[in-house]
Curated annotation (Swiss-Prot):
The lineage of its organism: Eukaryota, Metazoa, Chordata, Craniata, Vertebrata. The keyword Nucleus does not apply. This is Heat shock 70 kDa protein 14-B. Belongs to the heat shock protein 70 family. It comes from Xenopus laevis (African clawed frog). Component of ribosome-associated complex (RAC). Keywords: ATP-binding, Chaperone, Cytoplasm, Nucleotide-binding. GO terms for biological process: chaperone cofactor-dependent protein refolding; protein refolding.
Length: 507
């Protein structure tokens, strides 16, 4: 039985198969190795991938894109709200969760983000099965380093609903290093590796220390304001200006025309990673006018010059954060489709002139390739010594809410970046004259204030003997294992009564 790895990104999805000692990305039914993470609802059918992306121009309100942004989030989550604002498909609140409102004329229904992700996972499963000629169920799935518990849970549910048996979830930077075998070839050596990922809607930079075959994250940062879509939008705006210059028509306010230009700009952007120029042709762009425009790589680089600067600054900030000079970095691994852009690669090379830059595996394929290798390891198809190669640290802050009148005081039990396994304990004080105590646990990325949406678990101690005076000490112990599972124990120190919960995590 083959092992596969699946990467579901914000704009694209990709599946790799581990077979005969190596991992390879497999092409979908359109012959493409990367599939747009787009789902379209038509009157008689649901379409996924390139067909859905191409039909979005005429079916925008029933086409869902960037579902990963909203997956596992509450309706009121700031990131979900940003997604809702930008979505052409109407999103409504149902039971505190966001739902897509689909109306094809034939049917009206609400669709959850998990339902959409399930359809994309099903497409990946079909792609792998078509390539292998047999059924496939076992999978390793990749997740961003900053994915919270609720997001990972939603992703796992979507994959399971698609018929997958999840062997493990693996962090994207970890998968990238596995793809290149970093730490395998010299398991006793020590090195620092920068993982640079420029995806469709975000940029992440991660510094990893590799020592004795173990990966340890020194620092990581994610920037949601910059991604491959930004380059596409910049090029589309340029094309709109060219159309106006030639035909004296400003189409920037025409959503349909701009969507056509976005599709053409996206194709041109990809072509310019390998060609010196690309032709942008749009049939009947506006008012029956066929638009034809050639864009050179030099022009594209000029149009996107400010974006390139935004893509490089995070590297400098990360180096400053960990106290490194460029010469302290031994390797740079490129991930994400937009990391293919030659100008970006050159700018990174200029920062690290003496450092090995790894891009022999296509950047948009390196993460699923690493996931497939991990799947092969777990199924015993590869040297199991490699199973020690894993990122061992917490991805976000774990906090407990203090029991006080304000209701807004939190204590960090486990900071993000803590090496795993880890055990932390904290004593909370509750009024002695109560018979039950509810302890609430929250998760935070450290960038925004802690809100109710951040709560991921609670432990209740019941039937406690009331005290006539004083306070009650509650010992809270949080243990996070290497696999990401959480074990939380709360004990009343007076009576010894305790409760424990376990939150499993396949990452």
């Amino acid at each position: 039985m083959a092992a596969i790895g699946v990467h579901l990104g914000c704009t694209c999805a990709c599946v790799a198969v581990f077979k005969d000692g190596r991992a390879d990305v497999v092409a979908n039914d359109a012959g493409d190795r990367v599939t747009p993470a787009v789902v379209g609802f038509l009157e008689k059918e649901v379409i996924v991938g390139l067909a859905a992306k191409q039909s979005r121009v005429r079916n925008a309100t029933n086409t869902i894109v960037k579902v990963k942004q909203i997956l596992g989030r509450s309706y009121g989550d700031p990131i979900a709200q940003k997604h809702i604002t930008e979505s052409k498909c109407t999103v409504v609140e149902k039971g505190g969760k966001p739902k897509y409102e689909i109306d094809t004329g034939e049917t009206q229904k609400l669709v959850s983000s998990e339902d959409v992700a399930k359809l994309i996972f099903s497409k990946m499963k079909e792609t792998a099965q078509s390539a292998l000629g047999s059924d496939v169920n076992d999978v390793v799935i990749t997740v961003p380093f900053d994915f919270g518990e609720s997001q990972k849970k939603a992703l796992g549910e979507a994959a399971s609903a698609a018929g997958f048996n999840i062997l493990r979830m693996i962090h994207e930077p970890s998968a990238a290093l596995l793809a290149y075998g970093i730490g395998q070839e010299s398991p006793t050596g020590k090195s620092n590796v920068l993982v640079y990922k420029l995806g469709g809607t975000s940029l992440s930079v991660t510094m990893i220390e590799v020592n004795s075959g173990i990966y340890r994250v020194l620092a990581t940062s994610t920037y949601d304001g910059i991604g491959g879509v930004c380059f596409t939008e910049a090029l589309a705006q340029h094309l709109a200006s060219e159309f106006q210059r030639t035909y004296k028509q400003d189409i920037r306010g025409n959503a349909r025309a701009m969507m056509k230009l976005m599709n053409s700009a996206d194709v041109a952007k990809h072509a310019l990673s390998t060609l010196g120029s690309s032709n942008c042709f749009v049939d009947s762009l506006y008012d029956g006018i066929d638009f034809d425009c050639s864009v050179s790589r030099a022009r594209f680089e000029l149009i996107c010059s400010s974006l390139f600067n935004q893509c490089i600054d995070p590297i400098k900030k990360l180096l400053e954060q960990v106290g490194f000079k460029a010469t302290d970095v031994n390797q740079v691994v490129l991930c994400g489709g937009s990391a293919r852009i030659p100008k970006l690669q050159q700018l990174i090379k200029d920062l690290f002139p003496e450092v090995e830059m790894l891009s022999s595996i296509p950047p948009d394929e390196v993460i699923p390739v690493g996931a497939a290798i991990q799947a092969g390891i777990l199924l015993g198809k590869e040297n199991t010594d490699l199973d020690t190669i894993t990122i061992e640290c917490s991805a976000s802050d774990m906090l407990v809410k203090e029991i006080d009148e304000s209701g807004n005081k939190f204590t960090v039990l486990l900071p993000s970046g803590t090496p795993l396994p880890a055990r932390r304990q904290h004593v909370l004080q509750a009024p002695g004259n109560i018979s039950s105590v509810c302890l609430e646990l929250y998760e935070s990325d450290g960038k925004s204030s802690v809100s109710e949406e951040c709560k991921f678990a609670q432990v209740v101690l019941k039937d406690l003997q009331k005290k006539t005076s004083g306070v009650r000490d509650i010992l809270t112990v949080l243990t996070m294992k290497r696999d990401g599972s959480l074990h939380i124990t709360c004990t009343d120190k007076d009576s010894g009564k305790s409760e424990m919960i376990t939150i499993e995590d396949t990452s």
